Structure formats: structure tokens, C-alpha cells
Curated annotation (Swiss-Prot):
Record GO terms (molecular function): rRNA binding; structural constituent of ribosome; transferase activity
InterPro entries for the chain: NA-bd_OB-fold, Rib_uL2_dom2, Ribosomal_uL2, Ribosomal_uL2_bac/org-type, Ribosomal_uL2_C, Ribosomal_uL2_CS, Ribosomal_uL2_dom3, Ribosomal_uL2_RNA-bd_dom
Any one GO BP annotation for this protein: cytoplasmic translation
Keyword S-adenosyl-L-methionine part of the UniProt annotation: no
SUPFAM superfamilies: Nucleic acid-binding proteins, Translation proteins SH3-like domain
Annotated SMART domains: Ribosomal_L2, Ribosomal_L2_C
Stated family: Belongs to the universal ribosomal protein uL2 family.
Protein's recorded name: Large ribosomal subunit protein uL2
Amino acid sequence: MAVVKCKPTSPGRRHVVKVVNPELHKGKPFAPLVEKNSKSGGRNNNGRITTRHIGGGHKQAYRIVDFKRNKDGIPAVVERLEYDPNRSANIALVLYKDGERRYILAPKGLKAGDQIQSGVDAAIKAGNTLPMRNIPVGSTVHNVEMKPGKGGQLARSAGTYVQIVARDGAYVTLRLRSGEMRKVEADCRATLGEVGNAEHMLRVLGKAGAARWRGVRPTVRGTAMNPVDHPHGGGEGRNFGKHPVTPWGVQTKGKKTRSNKRTDKFIVRRRSK
């Protein structure tokens, strides 16, 4: 994998930095594991904008990724690594010994021809999935379940991982990349190693159009708007003279947004600033 800085042949190419991985499959994805993925444009079923700055972008097909990794005791061979437009991580197409194929998140160091396995008897090596009660304390893992059998939810982005720092009875304590310490049931599964494609964070789009290709629309500052459009709008100068708020008047910049008190007891330490 190489990080390539483009030559300044035009203003739009001058600042582009891209990640090139010659190991990625150059053909089409495995058709039985692909389904249609319609864009919402940030609108809900009433047609109202629920998430700003979303719209347009290249059409994408959704790759069905196996986050549960519940095919126990059957070894699988990695056939190829693939690009996935729906996530920052790459994915791997694996062939199980019984003939079934599945997509999984590609961990760091995984390559075509490697063998992986799931279940309590799986070896402690990158790419294998086990319940966390069977994984040594201190190990780095990814694709971590929050409820047994639900499928991995934590640490799925490129280059991310979670560290198991303690095991106490029915729970294990995890240290997330944000600094948060959290308890999860020991029967929850996790995949050993960290997610691959860590160089994703080094890429530079280089121009606004590259963001539009990805379905990202412009973000306009509130101070650049009129008073009818935003609480920060209007005025002769650049100051808006009040505490920063969202377009709907809700305090921003530091205001707590977490409301799920039911699971507060599982958070040992809040994330570091």
C-alpha cells in the first residue's frame, strides 16, 4: 500500500493525496453478496431534511458484510481483498470449506490465501473471531459486539481497534480509541487484530468536487446567512455576539448530547477530550 501525492497538473490535482493498494481486486464484486442501495439525500419518509450536507454522489451498490462471524468451526480461505465504497475499511471475500462465500472486514496484514476461523476453538491470530472470554487480556480487537449475537458494532472503521484491558466475571472492560472505558458482556464476540487500511486518514480530497462525488454537500457558516436562516445570521460585522447555537437554537460546542441513561452503568470512564 502506498500514499501517493499527485503532481500539480491542474488546480484540482495540486493538493490531492491518494492511497493506492495494488492488492485490491480490480473486477466487480461477488454478485450474490451485492444488493441495491438507494440514497436518501438526508431526507426522511416525509421528505424533510433530517441530516444536512448530504445529497448527490456516485451510485453505490451495498456489499453484504458478515459482522456476526458466527460460522463456527469451519475454516475459510481469503480469496481476495476488495474496495468497499460504503466504508473506509477494505473488505475480504472468504471461501468457507463448505463452499459458502462471505465478505468480512479486512484486518491489518490479511492477504489472499490466508486462513481464518470463528468459534471458541479458533487460534489467537489476526482475523479469527472468538468470544471475548476466550481472548487474552491486553489483546487488540475490532468488530466488537455490544450484545451477544447481534454482530460487531464497535471498531469497524479503517485503522481502528479496541483493547481488552480487564476481565471480571461475566464482563470484560474495553478501552476504545476515544479513551472511553466500557464494560461489555464476555460472551460478545470480537475479531483479533486491528482494521486494515489505516492510511485512509492520510488521503486528501484536494477539491470540493471530490467531496460531491462522495455525496457530501457544502457546509455554510451561520454567520454567512441572514437572520431568517440562522441565529448567527445578519449584522454588519463578523461577530454574532452570543453563545454558539445550532440553526434550531440549541446550544452547541460542548453541550452533552447523550441521553441513554439505561447503559450509563456500562461506561467506566467517559472519553477523553
